[in-house]
A protein has these predicted regions:
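Helix C-cap/helix->beta junction micro-motif
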Residues: 23, 60, 100-104
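Conserved internal alpha-helix in NAD(P)-dependent oxidoreductase domains
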Residues: 84, 88-95, 103
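Rossmann-fold cofactor-recognition segment
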Residues: 33-50
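SDR active-site strand-loop-helix element
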Residues: 6, 30, 65-69, 108-113
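Conserved Rossmann-fold NAD(P)-dependent oxidoreductase catalytic core, especially the SDR/UDP-sugar
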Residues: 95-127
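NAD(P)H-binding glycine-rich loop region in Rossmannoid oxidoreductase-like domains
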Residues: 47-89
Length: 127
């Protein structure tokens, strides 16, 4: 089974990628920075760029995507000057990945180490 893991520059994505490799799975890791300390093949990817997401996932052609990338500085995420960027990454980036997975009939798992809303709220940021 082949995986594409986002957010391998962070703690969760890094650990997920290492565990997959340890278990003998094939995988490609991604994150925003140009290079990342990982034993897996790596590609730099801005998940807010819909076209780049489609190209990356299509080129890798994974059986599943494990989406760990996110804006994780929770306190800074609530600052007015960061709201648009946080939404672009955490909502828009996730949508980009989900849309490509749907198009390619590729499974997607979204996991987080921090705040995840239950989806029952009526407005963003007021879950």
């Amino acid at each position: 089974m082949k995986f594409f893991v986002t957010g391998v520059g962070g703690q969760l994505g890094h650990d997920v990628m290492n565990e997959l490799l340890k278990r003998g799975y094939e995988g490609v890791g991604s994150d925003m920075q140009e290079a990342c300390d990982t034993a897996a093949p790596y590609m730099s990817l801005d998940i807010t760029d819909r076209n780049a997401v489609e190209k990356a996932i299509t080129d890798v052609n994974p059986d599943a995507v494990i989406h760990c990338a996110a804006w994780t500085a929770v306190d800074m995420a609530e600052d007015d000057e960061n709201v648009a960027k946080v939404r672009a990454v955490n909502a828009g980036g996730t949508k980009n990945i989900a849309d490509v997975c749907k198009k390619l009939n590729c499974k997607m798992t979204y996991i987080s180490t921090d705040y995840v809303f239950d989806g029952q709220g009526t407005e963003p940021w007021k879950p």
